[in-house]
Amino acid sequence: MIVALKPGVTQESREQLMDWLQNLGLHIHVSEGEYQTILGLVGDTTKVDMDLVASLDIVDSVKRVTEPFKCCNRKFHPEDTVVEVGDVKIGGGNFCVMAGPCSVESEEQIVAVAKAVKASGANMLRGGAFKPRTSPYDFAGLKAEGLELLKIARQETGLPIVTEIMSVVDLPLFEDVDVLQVGARNMQNFDLLRELGKLRKPILLKRGLANTLKELLMSAEYIMASGNEQVVLCERGIRTFSDYTRNTLDLAAVPMLRELTHLPIIVDPSHATGIARLVPPMALAGAACGADGLIIEVHNDPMHALCDGAQSLRPEEYVKLAEKVRGIREVIGK
């Protein structure tokens, strides 16, 4: 249920209403806009007399929300959420590019790539230390050592780091990581989502291989309902009948999610296509359709990469792409 308050309501009057609603066993999410404050009520709202609430002098309107996702619902929070990572902002008109290798392989490699992407305007460094692989025989990352190498690259460049966490048991290792990524395969690992909700760190939540937008938003709801509202959504392609690319990039999801949620939305053209030459056009399409950012794989030697070299751009290719992305942003007035 959503209770929209009239402009100019005093703090005392608002708190009296909130105290009464909380005594009914409801949780309240407050969204303060420029002109109006909205109270989002979560819980058994059948206890609330809508007509009584609507009749109050301080209340402008009362509406029921039928969608199962509440915390991430734009109806609860009309203003765009801006997730901040140090000086970097994502959402609310702020565009963020996360770039780096699929896997951290060595100090020399990750530092070289970090310096290259920073020089081209990247805002954050991505790199995998814990890698979920389809085959148990494939390289699965350097794990804790990889995290330490990412920190070295951060120290060398000043770029915040984003990397994937796969299990609750690994949480202590990620205390000094700036953004924790939940990969497609873990999108519905609800125990992990609940624990991430207890943190005060931004979470990058990727859409699963065959999950609907509603399921993606319900996964975000798990994190937010546990207390962490710093969630960034990522469209990374879904599995379809087409076999020309690794996945099918669902760009229609971006404007659709924009209507449904206030959370920032970024696009991953690397995992979506699996083919390096297709990454630039799909990255530009992602920027053009209104995404709040991109996450792109860059490797200084893709031919010898231990993971996903086929979808990784060389630093010089990334430089050209970054310039074109800025051009697209200017064209669409961002």
Name each model-derived stretch.
Residues 139-163, 195-202, 251-265, 311-333:
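Alpha-helix-loop-beta-strand connector modules within alpha/beta enzyme cores
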Residues 1-97:
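Non-catalytic terminal accessory/regulatory regions of metabolic enzymes
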Residues 6, 142, 158-169, 178-191, ...:
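Catalytic beta/alpha-barrel core
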